[in-house]
Amino acid sequence: MPCPAQISDDLEFFVNGRKVTEKNVDPEVTLLAFLRKNLCLTGTKDACGTGGCGACTVMVSQHDPVCKKTRHFSVMACLVPLCSLHGAAVTTVEGVGSIKTRLHPVQERIAKSHGTQCGFCTPGMVMSIYTLLRNHPQPSEEQLMEALGGNLCRCTGYRPILESGRTFCMEPDGCPQKGTGQCCLDQKESDSSGSKSDICTKLFVKDEFQPLDPTQELIFPPELLRMAENPEKQTLTFYGERITWIAPGTLQELLVLKAKYPEAPLISGNTALGPAMKSQGHFYPVLLSPARIPDLRMVTKTSGGLTIGACCSLAQVKDILAESISELPQEKTQTYRALLKHLRSLAGQQIRNMASLGGHVISRHCYSDLNPILSVGNTTLNLLSEEGPRQIPLSGHFLAGLASADLKPEEILGSVYIPHSQKREFVSAFRQAQCHQNALPDVNAGMRVLFREGTDVIEELSIAYGGVGPTTVSAQRSCQQLLGRRWNALMLDEACRLLLDEVSLPGSALGGKVEFRRTLIVSLFFKFYLEVLQELKADQKLPPESTDSQRYPEIADRFLSSLGDFQVTLPRGVQTYQRVDSHQPLQDPVGRPIMHLSGLKHATGEAVFCDDIPRVDKELFMALVTSTRAHARIISIDSSEVLDLPGVVDVITAEDIPGNNGEEDDKLLAVDKVLCVGQVICAVVAETDVQAKRATEKIKITYEDLKPVIFTIEDAIKHNSFLCPEKKLEQGNIEEAFENVDQVAEGTVHVGGQEHFYMETQRVLVIPKTEDKELDMYVSTQDPAHVQKTVSSTLNIPISRITCHVKRVGGGFGGKVGRPAVFGAIAAVGAVKTGHPIRLVLDREDDMLITGGRHPLFAKYKVGFMNSGRIKALDIECYINGGCTLDDSELVTEFLVLKLENAYKIRNLRLRGRACMTNLPSNTAFRGFGFPQGALVTESCITAVAAKCGLPPEKIREKNMYKTVDKTIYKQAFNPDPLIRCWNECLDKSSFHIRRTRVDEFNKKSYWKKRGIAIVPMKFSVGFAATSYHQAAALVHIYTDGSVLVAHGGNELGQGIHTKMLQVASRELKIPLSYLHICETSTTTVPNTIATAASVGADVNGRAVQNACQILLKRLEPVIKKNPEGTWRDWIEAAFEKRISLSATGYFRGYKAFMDWEKGEGDPFPYYVYGAACSEVEIDCLTGAHKKIRTDIVMDACCSLNPAIDIGQIEGAFIQGMGLYTTEELLYSPEGVLYSRSPDKYKIPTVTDVPEQFNVSLLPSSQTPLTLYSSKGLGESGMFLGSSVFFAIVDAVAAARRQRDIAEDFTVKSPATPEWVRMACADRFTDMIPRDDPKTFKPWSIPIA
């Protein structure tokens, strides 16, 4: 088995109300693949393939014949096996509503609330909210947060998405008029300059939204109701090419099958088995599905406990536990409450809907969130087999996999019995992860204690940890030794010693973070100790001598209030901007919060991305083969076995390239040697994507390792391994200045790298034409001209033969500037060689492995200052990890050095930067282009000075900030007035000084939780440091019906550039937006374009569109003058009759920009964007976790072209920057392999990471004569403002260290992960853990910054 001669059963289910009957279903086909390939429903997106991002969310509806109810639940389509859907109804975003038929309120509101940018995540967001509303038409805010916890967005910062969802919620607290135009903020108020300005907070009009009518939703198909109530077949069997899927209808049938196929796993939600089979190479020829067996979903309540069927989903378990908690006295629900607590943060809602309790228990994953609690809660597993039922305890022996305490191969888990807790028993659960939700825990724990009646003497004690071994670890020996001990400080001391001795982690333990995880072992027990102590005190049964306030001052009553986890709340905020002038014509959209013009298409799934383009005739698929060595010579590439595989057409190597194989140091396909793990060596072309991907695993490459192998900046410096010369700027006499200061401080700063994590991975479709060697290319890129040039060079054909089309890009952030040209060129070689269209779509793991990201940075600084805080001298030396090739590293180094001074005027200043060459994938352009790393170094110097002077950091910032018209270190003049205004308004709007006092008061009263607050200024230079990179062109056609087609050189990445260009055209032509359209960006309509980057896309392309429209309007003047009362269409028809050209090319020559590095001076940037941000956080010193309490941002946008889009850019960049500085951590193996290459392992911010109060204000009454309509580009500047969260965390850590009498000047390391925060908050627990000599073990991961 499987046997092709056998005939599969028919699979019957519904999609969007229509019946689907499939014969010969392959069990390896997922719902996502079927929807996209078979049904052409491409609204459901493929972004990660592992169930970690939510882009593929759909709703599944199933009827339960036992309870006679129909369940609606969201799932990740990328994990759902198609064969599991027999009898189910699937609803995709296309089935919810469409522009062509009827928009659903969810779709309308997310678009009109400005909740879409690139739009790639939007269908998944829509489906999560839609499913929530099908179950709860008026949900609570908590339910909304839970529903979106499994959905990722890289663009918006989540706030507008949550705002759209909030419109369905029960009326929240706060101003009921917010967003309607009647808010008290929607009135005239004085700005900081004293003048009157119209301030508005209305980005959308809630009253215009259509109401939600639950009666209009699709009904569950009656045919499926009948199927569920009266199934025609007991057992369903589906035979695939490699796997057979069997779904029995009765428990007895399942037991017979399990006896026949004892090695066959049971597959329920496929949340563990699916990813394991895909990425870890696990393979099972037979899969047994118990989903159709009602017996395995039964729930039984008895006087002693709760029995839950093994096939109940974790979401159902959550509801069952919540119901029991509401029915039972509190003393009986201790275990249930602990389980419910973890179920709220375990994965996302979609995974909880899919994963089963039985699968979670049986998998015994080391990071299981429930097994530690179930283990200490005396849970019993009810096993079933043909031989009869059997019970075993969910004990440490079971978790360790001991044969005597485990399932037999022919047994299945039928149900789980969880007993009630009892009087004098306390159960708690703890978990610490990189972020609050949808993240695997670093360490979790379940703990239970039972006391002798009327005493604090331990009668029973159970402790189990996850994340500290290959499975859940039970600390049985420690617990046994503590029996009979009293619950006091002496017991605590002994318990910590015993636990560290028994639950040991080797220095090379999988997952790394060894010292952090060791600390958590005792820190979490201490939390449990305090919780229980508090409960005992509340019962007033604790003997007074049980505490020792001298030895453990933290257990005094005033510190117990610090306990408890951070609660997740729906963020709130105010967005303020300046209204347009009252005299501006209503049809003129410039300055108004116009919805993204693709917003509705995003929300309905009708927006077409690169891989949504329908399959082309004779199309083939390409998959890449990458290096597994960091530095090696290629001895041979053996593809002989591959060419015989089914569907494989060809293997593409460097020998097949007719032209140039990339640059000398950056080959498209490796020749002779490889320089990093992930370098592309060759590619396989096959008839399907699955065949191509499988075939790559069969290519055998023989290597000979080379020396040296360099991964870290430290090693690169040691080996003098650099990619380009040092970049240096200097002013004043720095040596002399250091001799004349009161104090000198020196330090280092480490800033980790960052993955772009655009939701749409790199992808390209190449279609060769039949004549003249022409190619049509559809690419997800920020720079189609670069793709065009690279392909031209690779194929040795003229550029004019290649047309690149870009409809829209699912996020870029700099990652689609250079790399798409490489993938486009490789695909083009395949297309020319085979003569077939080639589609190349990287999966998430390959994308993250190959493409590189933000440059990690290491910096050394020396700062001289007076006791007043005035900085007299500053010397900063920066090194960035460029990876194995130059790419954009020299430019990043230049921008890094140019922008290092940030907002500060320091008379004696030396700034240096170098790009290191290492054996890692080449790092590349990323939003901010070096500024987010460099400015963090400068602000760290400020923090160090503040600590030495005993002054608040904000005072040091104010004292050293630019105050008057001045010149930068590179001699460019500028006026800092907007900078000062932003700073002062941010101080005012955030009530900074009042809150600073409150933070200090909180910290005096709280020992284990600390708050921090920080405000940072920003001077961000916009644009490229070269005039030629600021040029732009546009083409505008007016058709005889009056409609207008606009083409320009910018690319729509989600930043709303197309929307802004049409706003410009509308103003210039004086016509409504409804007349205007942009089809795509194409190298045919606008040639020689510049990359859409550096925040100038809308600015320079807008000037080109403006120019084209002005030319056309000038031509139309005689016609208009002749018929002033005519309509636009009248004028166009008349112009056509008079043979007036209705097409015009617009052009903008660009801003002058230059930099002379020899002299160290120039005018490299057209203008600056100024801003300031204030953030307040609270940290848990015992775990390193933090929550964002509030953020206030003030940004100088001058006259915003579109306040809704610009505020969205600011918020999105801020959250992305916050991720850089707090949760996004790239981990590499000692062999140079990137571990963190999926959303499970690399944590970008989620909805739970948004500050509870998130306010953004565009600085009113600001002007700049240089730019288009006095607007500014805001795409990148908000990134660095995310550092306000970082420095607030640093402030909180400093408060903790201050209270413990530990030095406040500590090494600054970004990201400020829970690991860094916890270990920086040094205390007796960090002191007691064992530390290994680094020379005695090989670490699991290495730092590369």
Curated annotation (Swiss-Prot):
Expressed in olfactory mucosa epithelium (at protein level). Detected in skin. Coiled coil: none annotated. NCBIfam families: mam_aldehyde_ox (TIGR02969). Oxidase with broad substrate specificity, oxidizing aromatic azaheterocycles, such as phthalazine, as well as aldehydes, such as benzaldehyde and retinal. Cannot use hypoxanthine as substrate. [2Fe-2S] cluster 1 binds at C48, C53, C56, C78. InterPro entries: 2Fe-2S-bd, 2Fe-2S-bd_dom_sf, 2Fe-2S_ferredoxin-like_sf, 2Fe-2S_ferredoxin-type, 2Fe2S_fd_BS, Ald_Oxase/Xan_DH_a/b, Ald_Oxase/Xan_DH_a/b_sf, Ald_Oxase/xanthine_DH-like. The keyword ATP-binding does not apply. The active site is at E1276. It is found in: Cytoplasm. Keywords: 2Fe-2S, Cytoplasm, FAD, Flavoprotein, Iron, Iron-sulfur, Metal-binding, Molybdenum, Oxidoreductase. Belongs to the xanthine dehydrogenase family. It is an enzyme of class 1 (oxidoreductase). One of its GO terms (biological process) is xenobiotic metabolic process. This is Aldehyde oxidase 2. Its cofactor is [2Fe-2S] cluster; FAD; Mo-molybdopterin.
